[in-house]
């Protein structure tokens, strides 16, 4: 079972703005259009889509935004509500989540506001090996509106640090012809926690 406080179950009359369901992701302003209730409902909807695609496990990661932990916890709770097991990879870049969703399982969700201002957050989703978009994202909204899910027990949760394997994959793919001196500026992004170590492992001098 999850090792954290679970938000309350989404009330039947909960209003979710359709405006947060974009072409390629779900994205809103915290807490006015995006909160823990919305995240848990999305977890249930995505979990049902995963089950229909014969996916029993979903990887979940998040960027460094302050709203990330609460939204991630609620999302995980929603996935587990409908019987989908979760691999929580914690703070990571979106490429690291995609890596986890291709090596540890085949589906994943990254809690991220991408390039948007700090009060935004959102979800990028991979289902059965491919990013979902367009009609598939709108179908999640319709499922939430209809409360179209079946609660199911038996899901498991465990944490996984994917950085070592991710770094080794990069080191296996990239070979520098000469040493380089580079400056890394992640613009307050979560890559600031991972990129310098990866570049140093490649043989770069990082300033």
Where are these regions (language model features)?
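Aromatic (phenylalanine/tyrosine) cluster motif
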Residues: 4-5
């Amino acid at each position: 079972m999850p090792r954290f406080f679970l938000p309350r179950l989404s009330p039947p009359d909960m209003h979710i703005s359709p405006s947060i369901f974009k072409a390629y992701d779900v994205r809103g302003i915290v807490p006015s259009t995006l909160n823990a209730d919305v995240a848990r409902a999305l977890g249930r909807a995505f979990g049902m889509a995963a089950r229909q695609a014969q996916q029993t496990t979903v990887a979940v990661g998040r960027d460094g935004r302050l709203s990330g932990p609460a939204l991630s916890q609620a999302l995980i709770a929603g996935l587990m509500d409908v019987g989908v097991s979760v691999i929580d990879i914690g703070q990571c870049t979106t490429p690291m989540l995609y890596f986890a969703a291709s090596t540890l399982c085949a589906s994943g969700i990254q809690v991220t506001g991408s390039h948007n201002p700090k009060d935004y957050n959102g979800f990028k989703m991979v289902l059965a090996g491919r990013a979902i978009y367009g009609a598939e994202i709108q179908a999640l909204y319709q499922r939430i509106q209809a409360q179209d899910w079946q609660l199911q027990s038996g899901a498991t949760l465990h944490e996984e640090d994917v950085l070592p394997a991710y770094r080794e994959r990069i080191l296996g793919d990239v070979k520098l012809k000469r040493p380089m001196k580079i400056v890394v500026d992640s613009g307050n992004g979560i890559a600031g926690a991972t990129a310098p170590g990866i570049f140093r492992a490649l043989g770069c001098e990082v300033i």
